[in-house]
UniProtKB/Swiss-Prot annotation:
Membrane topology (Extracellular): 19-577
Example GO biological process: photoreceptor cell axon guidance
Residues with PTM Phosphoserine: S674
Any one GO CC term of the record: plasma membrane
UniProt feature, compositional bias: Polar residues: 651-669
First and last residue of the signal peptide: 1-18
Gene, per the UniProt record: otk
Basic and acidic residues bias: start-end ranges: 716-727
Membrane-crossing residue ranges in chain numbering: 578-598
Protein name: Tyrosine-protein kinase-like otk
Membrane topology: Single-pass type I membrane protein
Domain of life: Eukaryota
Similarity annotation: Belongs to the protein kinase superfamily. Tyr protein kinase family. Insulin receptor subfamily.
GO terms of molecular function: ATP binding; cell adhesion molecule binding; protein heterodimerization activity; protein homodimerization activity; protein kinase activity; signaling receptor activity; transmembrane receptor protein tyrosine kinase activity; Wnt-protein binding
Amino acid sequence: MISIYGLVMALMMASVLASSSRFQRVPQSQSVVENESVKFECESTDSYSELHYDWLHNAHRIAYDKRVHQIGSNLHIEAVRRTEDVGNYVCIATNLASGAREASPPAKLSVIYLESASVQLLGSNRNELLLKCHVEGASGDLEPLEIEWYRNSEKLSTWKNVQLDQHRLIIRQPGSEDDGLYRCTASNAAGRVMSKQGYVYQSSVKCLPRLPRRKNQKMMESWDKQTFLCRGKRGGAAGLESLPAAPEDLRIVQGPVGQSIIKEGEPTALTCLYELPDELKNQRIQLRWRKDGKLLRQVELGGSAPIIGHSFDSGKDALLREDARLVLHKQNGTLSFASIIASDAGQYQCQLQLEAHAPISSSPGILEVIEQLKFVPQPTSKNLELDAVVAKVHCKAQGTPTPQVQWIRDGENTTLPDQVEVDANGTLIFRNVNSEHRGNYTCLATNTQGQINATVAINVVVTPKFSVPPVGPIETSEQGTAVMHCQAIGDPKPTIQWDKDLKYLSENNTDRERFRFLENGTLEIRNVQVEDEGSYGCTIGNSAGLKREDVQLVVKTTGDGFAPEESGGDGFLVTRAVLITMTVALAYIVLVVGLMLWCRYRRQARKARLNDLSTKEAGGEQPDAAGNGKGSEQEPCLSKQHNGHSKSRSKSSGDAQKSDDTACSQQSRASKKSAHIYEQLALPRSGLSELIQIGRGEFGDVFVGKLKATLVTSPSDKDADTEKQHSNSENGSGGSGSGSTTLSTLNEKRRSKTSMDDIEEIKEEEQEQHNQSGLDQLVLVKALNKVKDEQACQEFRRQLDLLRAISHKGVVRLFGLCREKDPHYMVLEYTDWGDLKQFLLATAGKVNTATAGSSSPPPLTTSQVLAVAYQIARGMDAIYRARFTHRDLATRNCVISSEFIVKVSYPALCKDKYSREYHKHRNTLLPIRWLAPECIQEDEYTTKSDIFAYGVVVWELFNQATKLPHEELTNEQVVQRSQAGSLEWSVAEATPDSLREILLSCWVSNPKERPSFSQLGAALSKAMQIAEK
């Protein structure tokens, strides 16, 4: 109690006393292997006053000695002891002038150690064998102990009836193939240990290994390939222990007794001398060698007849693999090894087996192999990224005894530079990589056999970046000059390569008089021609990677293409040449158009026949005729099936396929199913009107417009009934509200929509009245401009599949797809109040929405914020149940209607309107302030990463979207801290107390510990009930 009180008082003094001192470096929590050294750093930014530093260990002042001492402001501990040094360390900075004190946050020290391991039997019966690996050790805050199980030196993994569950080994329905010696190993940063004693499991045999036969009866040669069923008496307990003993004169004189130690690569032999009486020479007797309980080699000593029966069966656990190094001599029973390898180490035993008798076994002998010292694998040179937080170079060595691994730096100074260390496994770790880390490093492995070394070259590089990227489009007139800039920085200095329409440009394949490649990377084109128009790409690269930017060159012609008339016959000749050229070109165009029309007619006729056959197979179901055949012309971007949720509703018969096989039919069958899906979504482009561009997204422009009411189809009855039943099962049905959007009735609508019953209401009647009234539907249109960009096309297809597969009131509807021509249009549901973020800013007074004679809408109440969060959680739960992920959940990607209904949408205006909320990371625009750490580090998107983003959305709601998450940090700092796991999150001040714990759990680094959307919905439901009271 006294120590805790002292710590509390020290922290209170630090928070109360005014001081200009702030910590520039605070002590960090660390995990260290026992007997290694550790350093806690502490430094204040107050350079104008004299400061005194003290250290506390578990709220007690540290008594310094030779092992624990303070150098400057830093604390050094040599030879860390787990019994004395574990705990919290606090740095106290005292201003000697003012007497003010400031305490750093506590830093935890965890000690990693590993002593022993043992195998414990938890349960054994005929249905299950349960073993546990008990380990004396700890791994601190790093990765947990790694447990491996072995059966007779064979490593086990989860397969068939074997299950590995943390420290436990479970074998379901154990049989004879599971017999053997079970041992376990444990490893962490402190080393690796194996259990000294294992557990031997031996199953019982249910019948005698004997077949009835008459006297002097000879078996056919092919009988050795037959399989015989051996069934014992029901309820009987006969086994190997009930077999009669072999005759006393059949015995093993000398076996592999004792322990043999052999160097790797040397020959050796194991002795098994036996005595075989003359009266048993005609009997079937077998000599066997076993290694760790498994059959290794066997040979027949008696009669030539094959041995049949369980006792002579090698079984599934045999090691009878082809190995020319092993020879079993029949004359004296010796097992010889031509060359010993490390895997030959183990326990060996020889046996004599007489038919229908218990085996005779020798005493076991131990063979130990002195493994040759070597690197596994050989260390290799590596390029390290400048300013990388952590970089590792591995060096693993094997040998007997276990070698010690250390690193040195070549040159005059062999010691390692600062921020470079070696862990217990021999891995060279670089922290905060800088240019001083460049050089040659040598890994030394040493044991009693000697020393080996391997040298690697470490090069510190800088990823190439554009200092002056190409900006476009560039417009120039014919005969003019075009200059496209492209300058880059990096280490090594990046090379710059230009290409036109994905074809590389160089001085060898261009006109040197017109094309100039400047030393700084700029491309200059003089006397520009019409054929120079196109897409130009600049690629920069070095050993650290590649980057590319595109720019469009547009050439404007100055005339109509005809040369002016000249005097005499020259002008006439030029005019005649132009007329002939235009005539030939027109004839060619007419021919091409005719061929295209003819091919389209043939394609539509073939498709009609296939649909007729599919209709007959499906029982007369009418084929989809949307688009009048235009959907059959597939763009390359939408010709592939990329999601398992897209399933075709009809299949063509084999005869129909064979009857219309052409040169392209084989290639088109693979995309028939996905093409059928897109045909069902087909919408005519003429049905869209009043398109207004609101921004640009990741693959094109984004518009708001109207869709003709005749083209709007209501959701299927099945989906509506399912959603209605789901809603009623939780909270019942509720009332309805008005659709007016005036400010005078706005507050009443929002107050009437804060209960769960009103949120769960599905306004089916109002939707039907809206559709029957003939009013055009307000829609969001996303254009696919980057048709040749595979990444953009893949994301376009993913969003299509996501919105097509979900029918839920909390997710916007997908009305269809316009793909008659480029660009393709994705048509989504939109609302009269637009995106949720603009609505929040308006209610917070950040956006001027007031008109004459009216006032701005008031801020949302806590009940209304909970209502919005609940609806978003329900929509995301529907996405999760459809086995999809959103990947960009934020208030900017949700929409809200005048009925206070919130839906999850996908505008993703990342190029202009909300560009400051996105950051280009690894050549991809990402909402890094909403992304989970695993998305930034490993590009891994799951439902748990959507849970992380949902926590940020709730943070936005309670802050009225007036500020960005971690707006005090730059984008690069957010990425760096997220990768390092040091980005700290806290809930908004207005968050109810009942939600704080579950919202904080949304941001934990381990995805498995985050809640589900159903759990979040339940918590929000309770919070809403409390708020209503």
